[in-house]
Amino acid sequence: MASSIVSSAAAATRSNVAQASMVAPFTGLKSAASFPVTKKNNNVDITSLASNGGRVRCMQVWPPINMKKYETLSYLPDLSDEQLLSEIEYLLKNGWVPCLEFETERGFVYRENNSSPGYYDGRYWTMWKLPMFGCTDATQVLAEVQEAKKAYPQAWVRIIGFDNVRQVQCISFIAYKPEGF
Protein backbone atom coordinates (compact mmCIF):
# COMPACT_ATOMS: atom_id res chain seq x y z
CA MET A 1 0.00 0.00 0.00
CA ALA A 2 2.86 2.31 0.71
CA SER A 3 4.23 1.74 -2.74
CA SER A 4 0.92 2.71 -4.30
CA ILE A 5 0.80 5.92 -2.30
CA VAL A 6 4.32 6.87 -3.33
CA SER A 7 3.68 6.22 -6.98
CA SER A 8 0.46 8.21 -6.96
CA ALA A 9 2.18 11.08 -5.19
CA ALA A 10 4.98 11.04 -7.76
CA ALA A 11 2.46 11.08 -10.55
CA ALA A 12 0.71 14.01 -8.92
CA THR A 13 3.92 16.03 -8.71
CA ARG A 14 4.77 15.28 -12.31
CA SER A 15 1.38 16.46 -13.52
CA ASN A 16 1.67 19.63 -11.45
CA VAL A 17 5.06 20.39 -13.04
CA ALA A 18 3.62 19.84 -16.51
CA GLN A 19 0.64 22.05 -15.77
CA ALA A 20 2.85 24.81 -14.40
CA SER A 21 4.96 24.92 -17.58
CA MET A 22 1.94 24.97 -19.95
CA VAL A 23 1.01 28.28 -21.51
CA ALA A 24 -2.59 29.05 -22.26
CA PRO A 25 -3.18 29.07 -26.01
CA PHE A 26 -4.20 32.29 -27.84
CA THR A 27 -3.05 34.51 -24.98
CA GLY A 28 -3.54 38.14 -25.96
CA LEU A 29 -5.52 37.46 -29.15
CA LYS A 30 -8.88 39.01 -29.86
CA SER A 31 -11.96 36.88 -29.88
CA ALA A 32 -12.89 35.07 -33.05
CA ALA A 33 -16.06 37.15 -33.37
CA SER A 34 -14.13 40.08 -34.84
CA PHE A 35 -12.56 38.10 -37.71
CA PRO A 36 -14.42 37.88 -41.01
CA VAL A 37 -15.79 34.43 -41.61
CA THR A 38 -16.77 33.06 -44.99
CA LYS A 39 -19.79 30.83 -44.77
CA LYS A 40 -21.32 28.93 -47.62
CA ASN A 41 -25.00 29.62 -47.67
CA ASN A 42 -26.76 27.29 -50.08
CA ASN A 43 -30.01 29.22 -50.25
CA VAL A 44 -28.59 32.57 -51.43
CA ASP A 45 -29.83 33.85 -54.78
CA ILE A 46 -26.67 34.58 -56.81
CA THR A 47 -28.46 37.16 -58.95
CA SER A 48 -28.66 39.46 -55.95
CA LEU A 49 -24.89 39.46 -55.41
CA ALA A 50 -23.85 41.42 -58.49
CA SER A 51 -25.56 44.18 -60.37
CA ASN A 52 -24.63 46.26 -63.38
CA GLY A 53 -27.43 48.72 -62.92
CA GLY A 54 -29.99 46.79 -64.94
CA ARG A 55 -28.42 47.56 -68.31
CA VAL A 56 -28.33 43.96 -69.51
CA ARG A 57 -29.57 43.29 -73.00
CA CYS A 58 -29.21 39.63 -73.84
CA MET A 59 -28.95 38.42 -77.41
CA GLN A 60 -29.44 34.86 -78.54
CA VAL A 61 -26.27 34.05 -80.40
CA TRP A 62 -26.92 30.54 -81.63
CA PRO A 63 -30.33 29.03 -82.35
CA PRO A 64 -29.81 25.27 -82.03
CA ILE A 65 -32.47 24.10 -84.50
CA ASN A 66 -31.81 24.06 -88.26
CA MET A 67 -28.67 26.14 -87.85
CA LYS A 68 -25.22 24.67 -88.40
CA LYS A 69 -22.18 26.15 -86.73
CA TYR A 70 -19.40 26.76 -89.23
CA GLU A 71 -16.38 28.85 -88.28
CA THR A 72 -15.45 31.94 -86.32
CA LEU A 73 -18.22 34.57 -86.43
CA SER A 74 -20.69 31.97 -87.76
CA TYR A 75 -23.25 32.90 -85.12
CA LEU A 76 -23.49 36.39 -86.61
CA PRO A 77 -25.53 37.31 -89.68
CA ASP A 78 -23.69 37.12 -93.01
CA LEU A 79 -20.92 39.70 -93.25
CA SER A 80 -21.38 42.56 -95.69
CA ASP A 81 -18.62 43.49 -98.15
CA GLU A 82 -17.52 46.34 -95.86
CA GLN A 83 -17.32 43.99 -92.89
CA LEU A 84 -15.40 41.44 -94.96
CA LEU A 85 -12.97 44.17 -96.02
CA SER A 86 -12.47 45.10 -92.37
CA GLU A 87 -11.71 41.49 -91.41
CA ILE A 88 -9.35 41.08 -94.38
CA GLU A 89 -7.53 44.31 -93.49
CA TYR A 90 -7.07 43.00 -89.94
CA LEU A 91 -5.64 39.79 -91.39
CA LEU A 92 -3.22 41.71 -93.63
CA LYS A 93 -2.25 44.16 -90.87
CA ASN A 94 -1.05 41.21 -88.77
CA GLY A 95 1.16 40.01 -91.61
CA TRP A 96 -0.83 36.86 -92.31
CA VAL A 97 -1.15 35.39 -95.79
CA PRO A 98 -4.75 35.29 -97.06
CA CYS A 99 -5.94 32.02 -98.53
CA LEU A 100 -9.39 31.12 -99.85
CA GLU A 101 -10.97 27.70 -99.54
CA PHE A 102 -14.33 26.36 -100.67
CA GLU A 103 -16.52 23.35 -99.92
CA THR A 104 -19.23 22.21 -102.32
CA GLU A 105 -21.00 19.53 -100.25
CA ARG A 106 -21.03 20.48 -96.57
CA GLY A 107 -19.62 23.58 -94.97
CA PHE A 108 -19.48 22.09 -91.50
CA VAL A 109 -17.71 19.31 -89.64
CA TYR A 110 -19.34 15.93 -90.12
CA ARG A 111 -18.37 12.35 -89.41
CA GLU A 112 -19.50 9.89 -92.02
CA ASN A 113 -17.00 7.02 -91.98
CA ASN A 114 -15.80 7.04 -88.39
CA SER A 115 -16.91 8.40 -85.04
CA SER A 116 -13.48 9.82 -84.17
CA PRO A 117 -12.08 12.97 -85.77
CA GLY A 118 -9.85 12.57 -88.76
CA TYR A 119 -9.02 13.76 -92.24
CA TYR A 120 -12.40 12.97 -93.78
CA ASP A 121 -14.63 14.80 -91.32
CA GLY A 122 -15.16 18.02 -93.25
CA ARG A 123 -12.38 20.11 -91.74
CA TYR A 124 -10.25 20.23 -94.87
CA TRP A 125 -11.67 22.19 -97.76
CA THR A 126 -10.47 22.61 -101.33
CA MET A 127 -8.07 25.50 -101.80
CA TRP A 128 -9.16 28.24 -104.21
CA LYS A 129 -6.08 28.93 -106.34
CA LEU A 130 -2.84 29.43 -104.39
CA PRO A 131 -2.34 31.35 -101.14
CA MET A 132 -2.04 35.07 -101.82
CA PHE A 133 1.59 35.57 -100.76
CA GLY A 134 2.64 39.21 -100.86
CA CYS A 135 -0.95 40.49 -100.99
CA THR A 136 -1.37 43.87 -99.29
CA ASP A 137 -4.74 44.93 -100.71
CA ALA A 138 -7.97 43.76 -99.08
CA THR A 139 -10.00 44.51 -102.21
CA GLN A 140 -7.88 42.00 -104.14
CA VAL A 141 -8.88 39.27 -101.67
CA LEU A 142 -12.53 40.33 -101.87
CA ALA A 143 -12.35 40.15 -105.67
CA GLU A 144 -11.15 36.55 -105.35
CA VAL A 145 -14.10 35.81 -103.04
CA GLN A 146 -16.48 37.21 -105.67
CA GLU A 147 -14.80 35.10 -108.35
CA ALA A 148 -15.13 31.95 -106.21
CA LYS A 149 -18.80 32.74 -105.56
CA LYS A 150 -19.38 33.09 -109.29
CA ALA A 151 -17.59 29.82 -110.10
CA TYR A 152 -19.29 27.83 -107.29
CA PRO A 153 -22.58 29.52 -106.28
CA GLN A 154 -23.67 26.51 -104.17
CA ALA A 155 -20.40 26.32 -102.20
CA TRP A 156 -19.21 27.74 -98.92
CA VAL A 157 -16.21 30.06 -99.19
CA ARG A 158 -13.95 30.84 -96.27
CA ILE A 159 -10.95 33.09 -95.81
CA ILE A 160 -7.97 31.87 -93.83
CA GLY A 161 -5.10 33.93 -92.46
CA PHE A 162 -1.92 31.87 -92.45
CA ASP A 163 1.21 32.87 -90.53
CA ASN A 164 4.05 31.60 -92.70
CA VAL A 165 6.68 32.21 -89.99
CA ARG A 166 5.04 30.12 -87.28
CA GLN A 167 3.37 27.94 -89.94
CA VAL A 168 -0.05 28.06 -88.32
CA GLN A 169 -3.52 29.14 -89.31
CA CYS A 170 -4.36 32.23 -87.25
CA ILE A 171 -7.83 33.20 -88.45
CA SER A 172 -10.60 31.54 -90.39
CA PHE A 173 -14.08 32.84 -91.15
CA ILE A 174 -16.91 32.19 -93.58
CA ALA A 175 -17.02 34.76 -96.38
CA TYR A 176 -19.97 33.26 -98.26
CA LYS A 177 -22.69 30.69 -97.59
CA PRO A 178 -25.07 29.37 -100.25
CA GLU A 179 -28.75 30.32 -100.11
CA GLY A 180 -30.69 28.51 -97.42
CA PHE A 181 -27.82 28.11 -94.95
Curated annotation (Swiss-Prot):
GO terms for biological process: defense response to virus; photorespiration; reductive pentose-phosphate cycle. GO terms for molecular function: ribulose-bisphosphate carboxylase activity. Residues 1-57 form a transit peptide. Its main location: plastid. It is found in: Plastid, Chloroplast; Cell junction, Plasmodesma. InterPro entries: RuBisCO_ssu, RuBisCO_ssu_dom, RuBisCO_ssu_N, RuBisCO_ssu_sf. Transmembrane segments: none annotated. One of its GO terms (cellular component) is chloroplast. Keywords: Antiviral defense, Calvin cycle, Carbon dioxide fixation, Cell junction, Chloroplast, Host-virus interaction, Photorespiration, Photosynthesis, Plastid, Transit peptide. The basic functional RuBisCO is composed of a large chain homodimer in a 'head-to-tail' conformation. In form I RuBisCO this homodimer is arranged in a barrel-like tetramer with the small subunits forming a tetrameric 'cap' on each end of the 'barrel'. Belongs to the RuBisCO small chain family. RuBisCO catalyzes two reactions: the carboxylation of D-ribulose 1,5-bisphosphate, the primary event in carbon dioxide fixation, as well as the oxidative fragmentation of the pentose substrate. Both reactions occur simultaneously and in competition at the same active site. Although the small subunit is not catalytic it is essential for maximal activity. Involved in antiviral defenses. (Microbial infection) Binds to tobamovirus movement protein; this interaction seems required for viral systemic movement. Heterohexadecamer of 8 large and 8 small subunits. This is Ribulose bisphosphate carboxylase small subunit, chloroplastic 1. The gene is RBCS1.
